[in-house]
Amino acid sequence: MKEFRTEIKVTPSTQAVQFKTGILTQGSCFSDAIGHRLATYKLRTLVNPFGVIYNPESIHKVLQYGIFNEPVPEHTYLRNSEVFLNYDFHSEFSALKKEDIVSSILNTIGSTHYFLTDAGWLLLTYGTAWVYRRKDTGEIVANCHKLPSDMFTKSLMTADEVSSSFKTFYGQLKKFNPAIKIILTVSPVRHLKDTLELNSVSKSVLRVACHQLATQFEDVEYFPSYEMMLDDLRDYRFYKSDMLHPTEDAEDYIWEKFMERYFSPELKDFVKRWKVILSAIRHKPFHPETASHRQFLLDTLKKLDDLKTQVDVQQEITLVKQQLTKSS
């Protein structure tokens, strides 16, 4: 039968993700989408610890803070409308008192440093090659925090600049954790504020840089989430109403491809078993007091008990026991 779509076929990676592998994700909101799915399936995951960040230079910079475990420079802090923020971080790092945001950032740097010491994988999702520089320092910022536009200059990073920034970061990371492997992705989210034409230019820069880096380093891989959205799914029904962000169905499709490529056979087997348990836990019966539902909960509890030597399922066990108590 003739094929009516251009599906991207993935092959298993030679370096599979194992069960106890630590995975850190950082980058655009697509890093959140993948990271939270990793966490849902009980992998040891640190998801976008520094908040959503779009450009490669800023992504590398916050992770460098994590590697060196040092306070961020004083000149990166700012105050806008009585709120303290930081140019290098997402606005989720904000406070009415400066000492509070400093403490929050330092705690995040410390936890990231600790996680990176033995993490097996780092997933970086680049969102845009467009960057904003402070006019007073010339530094690229992760977030302009709604400050006047005349305080910044906008420019497009070149593929060589992205690669150079990555290589500096890569050298520091590998010195800190020689065993860590890196997955590069380009976010499938479209940046309409740059216009569709310039969004294409930006994504092209990121894609070329990722190709160069994945070709140059054996422990750096490219995962084609961007191409899966544009060339495989290729339909507006897979975009949310803003026509910029992938729907949950699209994210699930890309997630399935991600698992197909990177998960070990043992991990894939666990995912199948965990899906059944998740479905059972989320099930909302019409008549929870029936004997059949009570047996359903007891069966689920047995499945959880069988897995507790592999992963921490105490939260799920507690939840099912609470449901059993209510059904008595």
Give residue spans per PLM region.
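Extracellular glycan-modifying ectodomains
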Residues: 1-328
